[in-house]
């Protein structure tokens, strides 16, 4: 009976391992999926900001218009990288975590089967003990009960050994996957933020280089010329704003506007749909990420 109790304790420990994996991996999957969705929403809001900056730039003088244009282009580039970040999180983090549902279900089925075999062994041993107490002289019945108990014990040993091997393989794979998934998560975030810092630095420098005094002088010259408060000085490079918006100069701005068009078509909830995965190393060598 001590052997039976020892095996039961062993199975309970393995069951706890699977239960904890089911609980925490499920929470990881849910939280990281929410993290990815919110990152996609942040990308969409930034796309809207880029669009508003473009519209605003078309109403301003050439100096400010050029500055805001370049600034918007940099923000659009960051959203390219953020789009790539979302795609990689889906492929490298969310999808592997989702696979654990099926693995845990199969392991639980193996545990349940092993427990049924153990319960049968306990019943056979209890039956044998009762026969020995009630009919100690009935050697035939006792012999049959001993045979059944021995057969049940062999089945239990075999089932327990199989379960130990199954849970051991499950635990090993779980540890490897845990390390790989979160390593990929950190790598994805580091690559995005490294690229974002690079582009944001360019955006900051664009704003620092903006000649506010020149723009203000141009504005004052125009307003004084209109209302006759003084002679307007000759202007250089102050052609009036074109009647149509300036063309989008980069693929980043074009892809931003394309995402805006998708949202207008009622597809704003599709930001977390999986797309073809782009290798992490590709992001490190490119200046802007794919979107569609």
Curated annotation (Swiss-Prot):
This is CBY1-interacting BAR domain-containing protein 2. The BAR-like domain displays limited similarity to other BAR domains. Residues 131-153, 229-292 are annotated as: Disordered. Its main location: cytoplasm. Homodimer (via BAR-like domain). Heterodimer (via BAR-like domain) with FAM92A. Interacts with CBY1. Residues 6-217 are annotated as: BAR-like. Transmembrane segments: none annotated. Keywords: Cell projection, Cilium biogenesis/degradation, Cytoplasm, Cytoskeleton. Residues 266-280 have a biased composition (Acidic residues). InterPro entries: AH/BAR_dom_sf, BAR_CBAR1/2, CBAR/FAM92. Pfam families: FAM92 (PF06730). Residues 138-153, 249-258 have a biased composition (Polar residues). May play a role in ciliogenesis. In cooperation with CBY1 may facilitate ciliogenesis likely by the recruitment and fusion of endosomal vesicles at distal appendages during early stages of ciliogenesis. One of its GO terms (cellular component) is cytoplasm. The keyword Flavoprotein does not apply. Belongs to the CIBAR family.
């Amino acid at each position: 009976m001590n052997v039976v109790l020892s095996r039961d304790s062993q199975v309970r420990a393995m069951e706890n391992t699977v239960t904890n994996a089911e609980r925490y991996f499920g929470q990881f999957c849910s939280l990281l999926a929410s993290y990815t969705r919110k990152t996609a929403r942040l990308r969409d809001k930034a796309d809207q900001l880029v669009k508003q900056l473009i519209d605003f730039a078309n109403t301003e003088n050439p100096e400010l218009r050029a500055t805001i244009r370049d600034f918007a282009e940099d923000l659009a580039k960051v959203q390219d990288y953020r789009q790539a970040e979302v795609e990689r999180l889906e492929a490298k983090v969310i999808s592997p975590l989702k696979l654990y549902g099926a693995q845990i279900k199969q392991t639980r089925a193996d545990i349940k089967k092993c427990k049924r075999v153990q319960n049968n062994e306990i019943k056979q041993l209890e039956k044998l003990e009762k026969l020995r107490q009630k009919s100690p002289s009935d050697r035939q019945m006792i012999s049959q009960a001993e045979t059944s108990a021995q057969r049940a014990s062999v089945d239990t040993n075999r089932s327990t050994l199989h379960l130990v091997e199954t849970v051991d393989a499950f635990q090993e794979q779980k540890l490897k996957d845990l390390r790989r998934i979160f390593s990929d998560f950190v790598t994805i975030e580091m690559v995005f933020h490294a690229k974002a810092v690079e582009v944001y630095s360019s955006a900051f420098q664009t704003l620092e280089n903006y000649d506010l005094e020149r723009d203000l002088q141009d504005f004052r010259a125009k307003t004084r010329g209109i209302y006759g408060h003084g002679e307007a000085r000759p202007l250089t490079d102050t052609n009036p704003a074109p009647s149509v918006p300036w063309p989008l100069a980069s693929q980043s701005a074009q892809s931003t506007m394309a995402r805006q068009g998708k949202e207008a078509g009622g597809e704003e909830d599709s930001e977390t749909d999986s797309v073809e995965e782009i290798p992490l190393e590709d992001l490190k060598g490119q200046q802007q990420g794919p979107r569609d």
